[in-house]
């Protein structure tokens, strides 16, 4: 088999394993996006709601909303805005995490027909104006009274922010019958999570629900569920984007869970008390990063005393997570020394390439040794071209006599693939790369593509002129040329495509990928070029001896 065919075989095998890995990772480890963007998570009591009630029509709702006031609250990490209509949280901005326009990221987009990031409703009975009272710097209370079936109820919503600037909000609700001697005539209450987390997917254009997915965690597993009804005890439910999420936890949830079209629909809870009712929810609204999420697993690490909530399970673990963890630690060490994530990616890539250099060297040396046998191999191929069995026997004999393994050039390449995928996954999903600048004015955010010019509209499928994809393509071509011992004129059309078409194809595939990922790819290409040059010099010296 010629050297070019062996290289082609290695490329085919690499592409095959790339496809298998992406399929497995997508099926078992990636998020599934729901088909409906309305996020409504309801909690209904376990007896039928069949009593008459007084509903509020749409005109009354609009009138109340128009007369409502907004209450601004600032904490160390949040800009929060409450509305006295419903006592709901209608805006929640993250102070320390900015979008491309350098404004705090908005965790909720409120439309006319929606009432905030999360809210409690007893049918339409609580769509009313609330009074506001600031209990202390961290606790804010909203209160209202309403009439239902000739009985009067007091409804209180109490929000408590973390005293330690944790991305968690405690929501307590209290429903009291003003006449304590009477039982409740209300059998229905619903918790609604309507999270439209902000994404800036195109320059200057804010979008919501992009890359938004729902998940539910129970029985020690992160699940997306199947359509139908099942009885579960979830620890939390939530909505996530690539970098941010809203998760809701409640103690002792023993519920019936109904899911339709991969969208969370209904939870059935236990019956409320006779004359009073209270409940507590914990809402995480912040970065989708284990450093922020895992503190709620131990009660001594958070101001709310929560433990074993396991919010961190919302961050899916890749198939190669065990490789990504040490890589992330190494990258963090580099950042602590030189606080630039772009340089950390470069240094990490160099470290990884040095560690796998023995495999690369072995692969290239095996290929070089096989190339020395080309004259003898061609003689055998010509001599036994009409006898395939004898041809294979003679080729095997030649390999044994020369001490050459024909697969020696392929296996080391395949062994490097897990490292490649682990580094790819780390750079592509690492939260701390969001908003991290490498070269100001050019690469201002490692989590999105670089840009030197913005068109203001789409040209073909692009909105920006980017430099990194061109550098990636050129270095990939140079790497391919240097690693090959076959001249261009001796290549067939299929071989020419694999050698030179693949870098061009990757140029289009990776054009809009995060710049951090392209920096990793370019560093790999440059290191490979230098590495191949060194190996060729080493092999040449061995031949001269």
From Swiss-Prot:
**Which InterPro entries does this UniProt record tie to the protein?**
Membr_insert_YidC, Membr_insert_YidC_N, YidC/ALB3/OXA1/COX18, YidC/Oxa/ALB_C, YidC_ALB_C, YidC_periplasmic_sf
Task: Provide the protein's localization.
Answer: Cell inner membrane
List where the protein spans the membrane: 10-30, 319-339, 341-361, 407-427, 467-487, 502-522
Q: Which UniProt keywords apply?
A: Cell inner membrane, Cell membrane, Chaperone, Membrane, Protein transport, Transmembrane, Transmembrane helix, Transport
What's its membrane topology?
Multi-pass membrane protein
What GO annotations for molecular function exist for this entry? Answer: membrane insertase activity
One GO BP annotation of this record: protein insertion into membrane
- For whether the record's keyword set contains Cell inner membrane, the answer is yes
- UniProt superkingdom: Bacteria
- Kindly state one GO CC term assigned in the UniProt record: plasma membrane
Q: What is its main location?
A: membrane
Q: What does this protein do?
A: Required for the insertion and/or proper folding and/or complex formation of integral membrane proteins into the membrane. Involved in integration of membrane proteins that insert both dependently and independently of the Sec translocase complex, as well as at least some lipoproteins. Aids folding of multispanning membrane proteins.
Read off the PANTHER family from this record: CYTOCHROME C OXIDASE ASSEMBLY PROTEIN COX18, MITOCHONDRIAL, OXA1
The record's comment on protein family reads:
Belongs to the OXA1/ALB3/YidC family. Type 1 subfamily.
Which HAMAP family does the entry link to?
YidC_type1 (MF_01810)
Subunit and partners: Interacts with the Sec translocase complex via SecD. Specifically interacts with transmembrane segments of nascent integral membrane proteins during membrane integration.
Protein name (record): Membrane protein insertase YidC
Which gene name belongs to this protein? Answer: yidC
